[in-house]
From Swiss-Prot:
Residues 1-251 form the CN hydrolase domain. This is Hydrolase Rv0480c. The keyword Hydrolase applies. Its EC number is 3.5.-.-. InterPro entries: C-N_Hydrolase, C-N_Hydrolase_sf, UPF0012_CS.
Length: 280
């Protein structure tokens, strides 16, 4: 399977960002990719009020993604925001394939919220609850968003649900060691799940993080998108600037790794005990 990662730099205008989706999806299709993965917050970058741009998954922006997928003949995974009843939004991925109706046509709401490094995502974002796996040209693809990557159990659960490739769409926070952590986490989650991991991040915004209502603590991207193999090897990686990565993956390697290393098969439940009980 040939996949592409679109490391873009989202702005605050959803219509302009949708044009970026069209541009990169077309380039990915021309390169022969069957799937193109965009970052978290493709619809609108983080660090600005999101409620005013949020739309339902059957709204105009998501339907624009579906149209692009059909016109380009490629499955698109992209980050957007949807409204909730409590005034917050969900941090959502839409996965839309070509066709009428689109196949696949699914969405995932980010489960683990980024209440860390001085940022409180849960103040404006409501969490999702359910892991999601979609099928793209016969390959089972798990969906995750940014901070999810720090939680190995989600990745092993997706693998147990049959995921052979797991997409993580991010707008990673900058800071000392953060790019290195991103790379290490993507490789580690590939090893945990014995899956390919397609880690698509926002490009480094440079000096673009200004504007009314902007938050300096918001994670707005560092680049460094990559594909990791089931053995944790980096198949392909990007720098910090906007770029389209293309990689060929062989899902037979997933089955081979799971058979040879057997992490998922040999994982054993254990009883938690307190410190007093653990003293011999």
């Amino acid at each position: 399977m040939r996949i592409a990662l679109a490391q873009i730099r989202s702005g605050t205008d959803p219509a302009a960002n949708l044009q970026l989706v069209g541009k990169y999806a077309g380039e990915a299709a021309t390169a022969g990719a069957q799937l193109v993965v965009f970052p978290e917050a493709t619809m609108c970058r983080l660090g600005v009020p999101l409620r005013q741009v949020a739309e339902p998954v059957d709204g105009p922006w998501a339907n624009g993604v579906r149209r692009i997928a059909t016109e380009a003949g490629i499955t698109v995974i992209a980050g957007m925001f949807t409204p909730t009843g409590d005034g917050r939004v969900t941090n959502t991925l839409i996965a839309a394939g070509p066709g009428t109706p689109n196949q696949p046509d699914a969405h995932y709401h980010k489960i683990h919220l980024y209440d860390a490094f001085g940022f409180t995502e849960s103040r404006t974002v409501a969490p999702g609850r359910e892991p999601v796996v979609v099928v793209v040209d016969g390959v089972r693809v798990g969906l995750t968003v940014c901070y999810d990557i720090r939680f190995p159990a989600l990745y092993t659960e997706l693998a147990r649900r049959g995921a052979q490739l797991i997409a993580v769409c991010a707008s990673w926070g900058s800071g000392p060691g953060k790019l290195e952590q991103w790379t290490l986490l993507a490789r580690a989650r590939a090893l945990d799940s014995m899956s390919y991991v397609a880690a698509a991040g926002q490009a480094d915004p440079g000096d673009a993080r200004t504007g009314v209502g902007a938050s300096s603590a918001a994670p707005t991207g560092v680049g460094g998108s990559l594909v990791a193999s089931p053995l944790g090897e980096v198949v392909v990686s990007a720098g910090t600037q906007p770029q389209l990565l293309v990689a060929d993956i062989d899902v037979d390697n997933v089955a081979a790794a799971r058979d040879r290393i057997a992490v998922l098969r040999n994982q054993t439940d254990f009883v938690q005990i307190d410190k007093a009980q653990s003293r011999g």
